[in-house]
Amino acid sequence: MLKKRFFLSLALKNKLLYKIYLYYNLYIRNFKYIFQKSYSQFNDDIFIKKFFKNKAAGTYVDIGCHHPFKLNNTYLLYKKGWNGLNIDLMKINIDLFNIWRPGDKNICSAVSNKNKISSVYIPNNNILSTEISIQKSYANTIKKHHKNSFIKKKILISTFENIIKNYKVDLEKFDFLKIDIEGEDYKVLKNINLKKYKPTLICIEDGIEKKENIK
């Protein structure tokens, strides 16, 4: 583990090593995940694909996309011929998407219900963790249950609409919405104009925090 983190820390400072690491991540480290019937953690994508079985082409929005195929809810749709928008606050994840899923629009940004400068909490200085969050209470809960320590870093956080505007994303409506952003899920969902975008299916993480009511 320490050797992997040491190499990654070097790769982040060298363009050639960084590119090598990206391809290592896709074709060696996670090769076993490429050829699967389901890419989701709990076979969510099988249900999603069946739900849209009569729709050959469509559009998805994946907020907190993490990886282009490993534990991913939209890769089956991408293989089917769909495309869409993937958003993640970690640049390395978006670079992986740009290599593996060039047919998508991939954006590096943190998302919440307000435009602001805030802190991101990264467990054990591990930039590949799925438990990175902008919510201190979420980080504290993870720390309590998994004994992880966190580093704190200031970043720019944007609303979904602000991202669409700033990156000039051509998105009038979409069919499928997935949100998994470690504690901010319901805030972001409530901030998206669902009447405008009209998704027919929404997948959101049932987090460890008490959920807000969605109306």
What residue ranges belong to the model's regions?
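Phosphate/nucleotide-binding beta-alpha loop and adjacent structural elements of enzyme active sites
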Residues: L2-K215
